[in-house]
C-alpha cells in the first residue's frame, strides 16, 4: 500500500466511525433539546448502514465507499439541522455542512468532494421547497439557498484544487521513489 492509499484508508476508517457515532450523538442532542428522536435516529441508522454495507461489500478504498462516505458526511449535518428546527441555533448548525465538506478532502478524492457538495446543494434546494423549516428557522428562502450555494461552490473549488494537487504530489513522489 502506498502513502496515498494509507491516508485514504485511515481517513475512510475514521469517517466511517464518525458517521456511526451519530447514531448515539443524534438522540443525545434530541434529548438535550427535548424533541422527539425516533425519526432522526432512524435516519442516522439508515445512512450509517448504507456506509457500513458499502464498505463491507466494496472495500475500504473503493470509489463507491468514498462516495457513500461523502454522502454520509453531508447527510449527518442535514439530520442535525432538521433536529434543530425552530431552535435559535438552527442556522448556526449550518456551519457543520461546511466543516463536513472540508473533511471529505482527507480522502484525497476530488470526485468524493463533488459528490459531497452536490449532496448539500440538492438537500438545501429540495428542502427549501418541500420542508423549509428543516433547514432555515424563518422557512423558505431561495436567496439564502443561493448564498449558501455560492459559499459551497467557493469552498469546493479550493478543496478540489487541494485534492488534485495532493494526489499528483503522491503520484510524483511514488514515481521518483521507483526510479
For every predicted segment, state its role.
Residues 1-9:
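Short, Lys/Arg-rich, polar N-terminal cytosolic tail immediately upstream
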Residues 3, 56-59, 95, 134-141, ...:
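Juxtamembrane loop-helix boundary motifs flanking transmembrane segments in multi-pass membrane proteins
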Residues 5, 18-19, 160:
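A generic "functional-site adjacency" signal
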Residues 9-12, 16, 72, 147-154, ...:
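Alpha-helical transmembrane segments of integral membrane proteins
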Residues 14-89, 93-102, 120-122:
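Hydrophobic transmembrane alpha-helices and their membrane-interface boundaries in multi-pass
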Residues 28-47, 51, 87-88, 110, ...:
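Alpha-helical transmembrane segments and their interfaces in multipass membrane proteins
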Residues 98-115:
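Canonical bilayer-spanning transmembrane alpha-helix
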Residues 171-173, 177-179:
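Long cytosolic alpha-helical coiled-coil signaling stalks of chemosensory transducers
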Amino acid at each position: 500500500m502506498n502513502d496515498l492509499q494509507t491516508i485514504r484508508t485511515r481517513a475512510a476508517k475514521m469517517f466511517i466511525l464518525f458517521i456511526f457515532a451519530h447514531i448515539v450523538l443524534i438522540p443525545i442532542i434530541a434529548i438535550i433539546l427535548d424533541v422527539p428522536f425516533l425519526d432522526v435516529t432512524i435516519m442516522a441508522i439508515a445512512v450509517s448502514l448504507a456506509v457500513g454495507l458499502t464498505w463491507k461489500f466494496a472495500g475500504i478504498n473503493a470509489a463507491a465507499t468514498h462516495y457513500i462516505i461523502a454522502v454520509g458526511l453531508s447527510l449527518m449535518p442535514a439530520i442535525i439541522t432538521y433536529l434543530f428546527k425552530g431552535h435559535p441555533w438552527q442556522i448556526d448548525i449550518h456551519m457543520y455542512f461546511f466543516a463536513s465538506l472540508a473533511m471529505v478532502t482527507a480522502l484525497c478524492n476530488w470526485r468524493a468532494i463533488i459528490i459531497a457538495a452536490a449532496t448539500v446543494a440538492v438537500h438545501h434546494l429540495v428542502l427549501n421547497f418541500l420542508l423549509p423549516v428543516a433547514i432555515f428557522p424563518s422557512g423558505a428562502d431561495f436567496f439564502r439557498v443561493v448564498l449558501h450555494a455560492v459559499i459551497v461552490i467557493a469552498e469546493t473549488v479550493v478543496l478540489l484544487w487541494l485534492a488534485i494537487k495532493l494526489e499528483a504530489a503522491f503520484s510524483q513522489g511514488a514515481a521518483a521513489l521507483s526510479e
